[in-house]
Amino acid sequence: MKTTSCPYFYLIPGSFKPPHVGHFEMISHYISLSKKNNGKVIVFVSNPKKNIRYTGSGGIITAEFSKRKLEEMFGDEVEVRISDVSPVKDCYDFGNNIENANITFGCSTKDEDLKRFDTIKRYYNTKYPKIIVSVLPFSVKTQISAKDIRMEL
C-alpha cells in the first residue's frame, strides 16, 4: 500500500556541480513554499559516469561534494539524494511509494528546463493519475553558469 505523511513534495533534479548562488536562490524559493504547506523539498544530484564535471585545473566535482555543499547550505530544510542513474528518473520513480500527494517539480527558466518538465508532468499524469503534478519554474535573480565556475576552479 502506498502511503505518505507529507502531502506536498518539491522535487529538484540537477547536477549542481558546483552548487552556486543561482541554485541557492532557487532552492530557497521552494523551501519557503514548502513551509507554507508543511511540505518537503528533495534535491536529486546527478552522479554521472560519463559526463564528469572537470574544473579548469583538472579536478573533478563529484556528486558527494555537491551533496555535502547543499547540506551545508540548507541543513535539515532539504533532503539531498545522489541519483544512481539520473535525477530526472529518480523524480519519475519517486511516485511509486506515495499516494494522493501534490508534487511540484522545481526548475529554473534557463535552457530546456521547462520543456523537460512538461514531459515529466505528462508521464506522471498518465501513470499516477491520483498524484497532482505541477511544474513551477523559478527565475533566479543571479544568472550564473556552473560551467563558468568550474573553469575558474
Could you say what each language-model-derived stretch is?
Residues 1-153:
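Nucleotidyltransferase catalytic core that binds NTPs
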